[in-house]
Amino acid sequence: MQPLLPPDRHHLRAAEGWLELGNDREAAAELERIAPEFSGHPDVLEARWHLGARAKQWDRCVAIANAVLERDPQRPTAWIHRSFALHEARRTQEAFDQLLPVANRFPAVWTIPYNLACYCAQLGRLEESRTWLQRALVLDEPTVKQAAAHDPDLKPLRESLGGALWPIVE
């Protein structure tokens, strides 16, 4: 896939800025300014995924992530985004099944084992959840601890450990 060039790259960056500021309407307007031949660029689609996620349009997010994966299967965020959208659409087993095959393809991405831990916890597979969370902690302990501190998806695991997750690493 060819890189986005100005002015399309500028519109994408502006859209990302608006997303960071929480202004979805302006972000969408900037994305609409991108030339039609680049509307399917993976970076543009990822920005559209974030808009859909903010609107909780999970089926749309699954479709967008699938489109990114068709164009760039080596992009770990596309795998993560698809599974996250499936989970939010109450299709947690499918989210797990879609993310598991790439866990070893992207061994340095902490979000993959972390999300697998969340999905396992929600599916009642607490030992498996614990194993995945340990794997995520090895990759980026400070970030994982911060993310997990109040993550409702990890509540079943937290409760099984007496309310605290951190005995996992001790």
Task: Identify the function of each model-found stretch.
Residues 121-122, 126-144, 170:
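TPR/TPR-like (Sel1-like) alpha-helical repeat modules
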Residues 1, 143-170:
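Terminal, low-structured helical/coil segments at or just beyond the last alpha-helical repeat
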Residues 43-111:
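Alpha-helical adaptor scaffolds
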Residues 42-43, 76-77, 110-113, 139-150:
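Boundary/linker segments of alpha-helical solenoid repeat arrays
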Residues 4-54:
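Alpha-helical segment of the N-proximal tetratricopeptide repeat
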